[in-house]
Design a protein with these regions (language model features):
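A compositional/biophysical signature of low hydrophobicity enriched in polar/charged and small residues
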Residues: 1-166
Length: 166
């Protein structure tokens, strides 16, 4: 089982939250600082089940720094169907919405685009989370436009650009 968690942090606290996440033994390769709709995206792979996710990750993360709450909001995205695994750091993550009956079609079409590193279908506020590579912001703009024009049945896209962790 795989999952993602998005974290929206109190203003100015994302560096401290990142430090606390690393203290929980999360790999830096699975923690992404984003410029976009959320501050941090965390990827979890190889989970046995939902109970393991809740006890090992969800509860500890939501309780980071209980004396001074720094996380305003979390969202959990449970992976329904995994896309390709990736080790390359993405330039951005796209959060996509489609009609439920089109999940597989959208996932397949996305994974046929060379700049798409992975496309996972998920339960949550979005239907697909997509890691992409781009050379720069212009390249990303062209890629998002291509996806919106070539991938059928997309109802909306939200982009989070990956920032350097430290």
């Amino acid at each position: 089982m795989n999952a993602y968690m998005t974290l929206s942090c109190k203003v100015g606290s994302f560096n401290r939250v990142l430090d606390e996440l690393i203290k929980l033994n999360l790999s830096k390769k699975d923690v992404f600082l984003l410029f976009g709709p959320v501050d941090i995206l965390v990827r979890f792979s190889g989970l046995k089940d939902l109970d393991e996710f809740i006890s090992k990750w969800f509860n500890p993360i939501r309780n980071i720094t209980p004396d001074e709450p720094m996380i305003d909001k979390t969202q959990t995205l449970i992976v329904i169907s995994e896309g390709r695994s990736f080790t390359e750091e993405p330039y951005a993550f796209l959060f996509l919405n489609t009609q439920p009956r089109n999940l597989e079609l959208v996932q397949e079409a996305l994974q046929n685009i060379p700049q798409v590193l992975s496309a996972d279908t998920v339960f949550g506020p979005y239907d697909v989370i997509c890691a992409v590579r781009a050379k720069d912001i212009v390249d990303l703009q062209q890629l998002v436009s291509r996806i919106q024009n070539e991938v059928p049945n997309i109802q909306g896209t939200i982009t989070g650009i990956v920032a350097s962790l430290y």
